[in-house]
From Swiss-Prot:
One of its GO terms (cellular component) is extracellular region. Its EC number is 3.1.1.-. This is GDSL esterase/lipase At5g45950. Belongs to the 'GDSL' lipolytic enzyme family. Residues 1-23 form the signal peptide. InterPro entries: GDSL (IPR001087), GDSL_lipolytic_enzyme (IPR050592), SGNH_hydro_sf (IPR036514), SGNH_plant_lipase-like (IPR035669). The active site is at S47, D331, H334. Disulfide bonds: none annotated. It is an enzyme of class 3 (hydrolase). Pfam families: Lipase_GDSL. One of its GO terms (molecular function) is hydrolase activity, acting on ester bonds. Glycans are attached at N37, N132. Keywords: Glycoprotein, Hydrolase, Lipid degradation, Lipid metabolism, Secreted, Signal.
Length: 357
C-alpha cells in the first residue's frame, strides 16, 4: 500500500524528450557503463521499484489496472504504481537498455536476464513483518529469488561470466516508508516492542544487514534511496485532517535517512562496498515547497480521483488529471514519473561520478 521513495524514467518510447543537460549526463553514463562492463541492474524494495512482481502474488497490493501505466509504453498497466516508468527503468534507459522487468514476469527472456531484474514487491520494507502484514515479499524473500536468478544466469552464460556480470552490476534498494506507514504506526506489534527512536534504530540494523547480505551475494556497487517526506503524502494529510505536511512523520523519515547515510559510510569504509545515497526526501520536499521551479502546478493532491485518498485499488478506473507532468503525486501516495525523473537526474550524476571512475 503506502510507499514511495525515490526515482524513475528516461528516454522511453512515448515519453517527452528529456532536457539537454540530462541528455549529457545520460551520454556520459552510457560511455562509462560500457567502459566498466556494467550491463545489469538488480533491484530490491517496495512499490517505488516494483515493476509488477505483485501481479503474481496473492495480495491486494497491485497496480496492474488503469489508470496506472497510462503514460507507460503503449499506455499499458504493468503493475507499476505510477503513471509511467519507475526509477530502475529510467536508469536502464540511460544505459541504453529496455525497462527493468519483474523477475516473476512469465514473458521474461534470456536477454532480459542478462540486463538484470527487479525482485521488489510493493508493500515491502526492511522489517520482514511489514511484508507479512500485506502478504508480499519481504527483503529476505526477494534475496532468495535473487539466488534463483543467479542459478538461471549461470546456466545461461556460465559460472565465470555470471559472477563477473553480478560483480559489475548496479544493485539498488528502495524501501522504508511502509515500515512506518503500514507497520509501526498502525500495527501494535512493534509499538509494544519499540519506541519510535528504537524502531528507527532497529530498521537501521536491518538495512545494514540487508546491504551486507547483497555484498555477500556479489554486490560491489549499491544505490540506496532514502525515505521520502511521508508527512507530505496526500493520503497522510487527508487521514490527519490537515492541508499542510505532517511534521512528525517527516521528522521520522529525516531521522531514518540519517541512519541510512551513516550505514552507507560504514559499508564503504569497512567492507569496500561502493555506495550512493539518493536523497528523495529533499528533492520531493523542495518540489512541494517550490513546485513552479520544477514545472509543477499541483503539489498537494494526487492526479488520480480526488487526489486525497485514492491509491492502489481505490484508484482503479478513476478519472485522472489532464496532465500528470504538472503533478508531484500520481495517486495519494506515489509520485508521478515526472517527479521521479527529477530525482533520478541527480542519481545518474552520482552513479557516473562515484561508481564509474
Amino acid at each position: 500500500m503506502l510507499l514511495v521513495a525515490f526515482v524513475t524514467l528516461l528516454v522511453a518510447v512515448a515519453l517527452q524528450p528529456l532536457p539537454s543537460v540530462l541528455s549529457l549526463d545520460v551520454h556520459l553514463l552510457r560511455q562509462l557503463a560500457a567502459k566498466h562492463n556494467v550491463t545489469s541492474i538488480l533491484v530490491f524494495g517496495d512499490s517505488s521499484v516494483d515493476p509488477g512482481n505483485n501481479n503474481f502474488i496473492k495480495t491486494e497490493m497491485k497496480g496492474n489496472f488503469p489508470p496506472y501505466g497510462e503514460n507507460f509504453i503503449n499506455h499499458k498497466p504493468t503493475g507499476r504504481l505510477c503513471d509511467g516508468l519507475l526509477a530502475p527503468d529510467y536508469i536502464a534507459e540511460a544505459m541504453g537498455y529496455p525497462p527493468i522487468p519483474a523477475f516473476l514476469d512469465p514473458s521474461l527472456t534470456q536477454a532480459d536476464l542478462t540486463r538484470g531484474a527487479s525482485f521488489a514487491s510493493a508493500g515491502s520494507g526492511y522489517d520482514d513483518l511489514t511484508a507479512n502484514i500485506s502478504n508480499v515479499w519481504s527483503f529476505t524473500t526477494q534475496a532468495n529469488y535473487f539466488l534463483h536468478y543467479k542459478i538461471h544466469l549461470t546456466k545461461l552464460v556460465g559460472p565465470l561470466e555470471s559472477a563477473k556480470m553480478i560483480n559489475n552490476a548496479i544493485f539498488l534498494m528502495s524501501m522504508g516508508s511502509n515500515d512506518f506507514l503500514q507497520n509501526y504506526l498502525v500495527d501494535f506489534t512493534r509499538q509494544k516492542q519499540f519506541t519510535v527512536e528504537q524502531y528507527i534504530e532497529f530498521l537501521s540494523h536491518r538495512m545494514l544487514y540487508d546491504a551486507k547480505m547483497l555484498h555477500r551475494l556479489g554486490a560491489k556497487r549499491l544505490v540506496v534511496v532514502g525515505v521520502p517526506p511521508m508527512g507530505c503524502m496526500p493520503l497522510i494529510k487527508y487521514l490527519r485532517g490537515q492541508k499542510t505536511c505532517v511534521d512528525q512523520l517527516n521528522q521520522i523519515a529525516f531521522s531514518f535517512n540519517a541512519k541510512i547515510i551513516k550505514n552507507l559510510e560504514l559499508l564503504q569504509s569497512k567492507i569496500g562496498l561502493k555506495t550512493i545515497y539518493v536523497d528523495a526526501y529533499s528533492t520531493i520536499q523542495e518540489a512541494i515547497k517550490n513546485p513552479r521551479k520544477f514545472g509543477f502546478v499541483e503539489a498537494s493532491l494526487g492526479c488520480c480521483g480526488t487526489g486525497t485518498y485514492e491509491y492502489g485499488e481505490t484508484c482503479k478506473d478513476m478519472q485522472v488529471c489532464k496532465d500528470p507532468t504538472k503533478y508531484v503525486f500520481w495517486d495519494a501516495v506515489h509520485p508521478t514519473q515526472r517527479m521521479y525523473q527529477i530525482i533520478v537526474k541527480k542519481a545518474i550524476a552520482s552513479i557516473s561520478e562515484e561508481f564509474l571512475v
